[in-house]
Amino acid sequence: MLCLALVAAAPAAPKEAPKEAPRGAARQEPRAAISAVLDDWHKAAGAADEARYFGHFTADAVFMGTDATERWTRDEFRVWAKPFFARGKAWNFRAVSRNVSLSRDGAVAWFDEALDTPNMGPCRGSGVLVKEGGAWKIAHYNLSVPIPNELLPDFKGRIEAHLKQPAPAKGEPSRK
């Protein structure tokens, strides 16, 4: 009983306040995970790993290509891309810089990235990822070719001339 009384009377050890992760570090972890997803997605294309590449998309994802006609659902994009994956190498994009932002609840992210591409030259990608079942998935991706402002008047004229050409008949190759 004396032992119990001594324990009860002893001053309690001061409790340490729970340690909080620094705000920057807490926000950095999802950004690193998102960058890893995007890097793996680009590597999957270079390795022609179709299942891995398309596995990074949500079921209702949209891919916007560089041509004005290129707006595809994930499944439409997969059909379009199938011949590229079948030949053993799709495309090779490498991010040289990337910015990632997160929603307050951490369930949605958006990004932009500068890309180095051997076939198209410098490109830019931007998009939205959502967290599904604990994994980040691409819900929307927009690929573009940045045009220096000084070159825009020439490109504008070339695009206008291109659009004045008659559209190909059904079944003919596109005017690309």
Task: Spell out what each predicted region is.
Residues F63, E76-P122, G171-K176:
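Surface-exposed, charged secondary-structure patches
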Residues P30-G46, F54:
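Mature N-terminal segment immediately following signal peptide/propeptide cleavage
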Residues E132, H140-K176:
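Low-complexity, intrinsically disordered terminal/linker segments enriched in charged
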Residues P18-I34:
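N-terminal low-complexity, Pro/Thr/Ser-rich intrinsically disordered segments
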Residues A8-P14:
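Boundary at the C-terminal end of the N-terminal hydrophobic targeting segment
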Residues M1-A8:
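Bacterial N-terminal signal peptides
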Residues A47-D60, M64:
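Short, well-ordered alpha-helical segments enriched in acidic and aromatic residues
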Residues L38, F57-T58, D67, S97-N99, ...:
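A mature extracytoplasmic/lumenal domain signature
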